């Protein structure tokens, strides 16, 4: 579960960007108020692909959860900041701030608007990113393990 604003889950107060992972068979009562996302990873999901072994690793993002099948991390960039060239496995990206990112993949440049609370599937890729917006990039990434 990802809090999109103030919520209370099992007596624990959560703020925008906070997560809580529930293991298979674990039960909970959803928040009675507030905005949040629930992400369910099914046991028979398609096989995960990863970039080739010689690609550079993802930058040091804050790891929020590291499990056997996936890692959840928070990705942050300041306006004007450019990442080093890096790779990701297949992942879900949830954008928390409205801003713009420029990415260079395979020599091609693309600028995209990041829309808050939008959940997107992102393929395995090697790229460089730059925050070209006026506010920081803040994303929650659920990266699948092959």
Regions found by a protein language model. Name each.
Residues 1-10, 88-107:
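Glycine- and acidic-residue-biased ligand/ion/polar-headgroup-sensing regions
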Residues 24-45, 98, 124-146:
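Ligand-binding loop in jelly-roll beta-barrel domains
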Residues 27-72, 76:
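Surface-exposed beta-loop interaction hotspot
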Residues 9-10, 38-39, 72-73, 101-103, ...:
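Short hydrophobic/aromatic-rich beta-strand segments that constitute the beta-sheet cores
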Residues 9-27, 106-125:
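Short acidic-glycine-tyrosine-enriched beta hairpin
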Residues 11-12, 30-31, 75, 82-87, ...:
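Short histidine-centered beta-strand/loop micro-motifs
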Residues 1-4, 56-83, 90-93, 141-142:
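A short glycine-rich, His/Asp/Glu-containing loop-to-beta-strand
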Residues 4, 26-29, 85-90, 127-128:
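Histidine-centered active-site/metal-ligand motif
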């Amino acid at each position: 579960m990802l809090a999109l604003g103030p919520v209370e889950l099992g007596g624990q107060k959560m703020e925008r960007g906070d997560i809580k992972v529930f293991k298979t068979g674990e039960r909970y009562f959803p928040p009675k108020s507030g905005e949040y996302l629930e992400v369910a990873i099914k046991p028979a999901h398609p096989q995960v692909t990863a970039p080739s072994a010689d690609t550079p690793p993802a930058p040091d993002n804050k790891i929020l959860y590291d499990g056997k099948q996936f890692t959840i991390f928070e990705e942050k960039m300041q306006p004007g900041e450019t990442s080093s060239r890096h790779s990701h496995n297949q992942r879900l990206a949830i954008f928390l701030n409205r801003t713009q990112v420029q990415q260079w993949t395979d020599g091609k440049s693309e600028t995209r608007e990041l829309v808050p609370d939008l959940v997107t599937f992102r393929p395995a890729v090697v790229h460089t990113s730059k925050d070209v917006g006026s506010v920081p990039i803040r994303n929650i990434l659920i990266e699948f393990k092959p």
